[in-house]
Amino acid sequence: MNPYRPYVVVNNVEPTFSITPEPTFETQPTISKSEIFETLRSILVTKYLTTFFVQPLEVAKTVCQVEEYLPKRTKIERDGKQTKEPYDEDIPDGTEQEGLSDDEHEIYAYFETPTTEKAVTEQLAEKLCVDASGYVTDPSNLIERSYTIHSKRFSIKSIISELWEKEGARGLWKGHTISFLHNLLYSGLQSWLSATLSGALAIADPNIISPIDSVRPLLSLFIKSITSAISALILSPLDIARTKIILFPISSSSYLSSASETSGNSHKKFKPLTIRQCLKALPFYCPSSLILPTVCYVSLPPFVSSVLPLTFRNFLGSSPTLDAMVGLGTSAVQFLLKCPLEMVLRRAQAQYECNLPPQTIVPVGKYTGIVGTIWCLLSEEDPGKFGIEGLYRGWRVGIWGMSSTLALNYISSNLREEVEF
């Protein structure tokens, strides 16, 4: 004890210093290259098999959308099966003119056109064919070839059976490789553009977080629409080549010639139509006539399907039942918009003139702009039973796709819940 500081108690125990352990951070497991390649291979195989199994339905739907289904009356007029025109009844033929007098002969001779004009008229009639609707058509399109298929009206099953009968299995899987490349490149390019643009604007990626759940939904929706449009415009040559390959007959072979060359050049070497030849003949950019239908087909249905749930949530709130009903209605609206726009786009791609053979397995319908093509489908071609069936050709394929997608999502969600449990 210290006499000067009796209040201090001496502790003989040596002081111990508490050592706080350093925090340990959990290190993330390193992903090896083999695992990355294995994941990429599984993704590629899944996408290729999906495209391979769906391709016959897509081929039949494309053929059904592009084919020109004319009413029976118009077909009879095109085939030239009508014997008399209404204005021909008043003009007597040669047998009737025998019993006429000289004055009547002079009257008929005065009103008759000279023989030279008749010859010129016949030459023009041979060069120009005008259908009942007033459009100038190519006479070669009216001639039925051996490779032309004859299917029932708006029947996917009939088109598949005709393709199988005339072209075999190759006819049903035409363009599956280029379809796989287009789908793969489109998904990859759209995801990269979306991630880059959303990172530059400091918002969540619309492919990861839905625009409805985003902090700035309108900006997220704009990014999703603009990236889809840019990706579709960049890959437009692949999409045009896909449509051309599907419509080109496999049973016949043709050569690549310019539009000015005729079919009489039989001494040239024949070549089958391939993907490489299509890409060489097509431009590397989207043609100006296809910009508007491509942008509308890619951007308009997703934009409307994203705006409707956002509007309902702002005005009516959110509940499981309401969200399910809104989701079902949104899918229906997207389907109603997508089918006519897809048909317009396919016809625009089929009518695009390039350095490719003109042969097609079906007569291709007209493309006169988005509104004009829809008007032609409703007024000039066969509209179907309900008047608008012509706008929704191949709708069963779309319904099957939507049903399979919903079923896969339901099964995957149930499996995820079982694994978490």
Curated annotation (Swiss-Prot):
GO cellular component, one term: mitochondrial outer membrane
TM annotation in the entry: 184-204, 218-238, 290-310, 325-345, 395-411
UniProt keyword annotation of Lipoprotein present: no
Main location: mitochondrion
UniProt cross-references to SUPFAM superfamilies, sorted A to Z: Mitochondrial carrier
Signal peptide from the UniProt entry: none
GO BP term, pick one: mitochondrial fusion
Membrane topology listed for this record: Multi-pass membrane protein
Role according to the record: Required for mitochondrial fusion as well as normal mitochondrial morphology. May coordinate fusion of inner and outer membranes during mitochondrial fusion.
Family membership: Belongs to the mitochondrial carrier (TC 2.A.29) family.
Descriptive protein name: Mitochondrial fusion and transport protein ugo1
UniProt gene name: ugo1
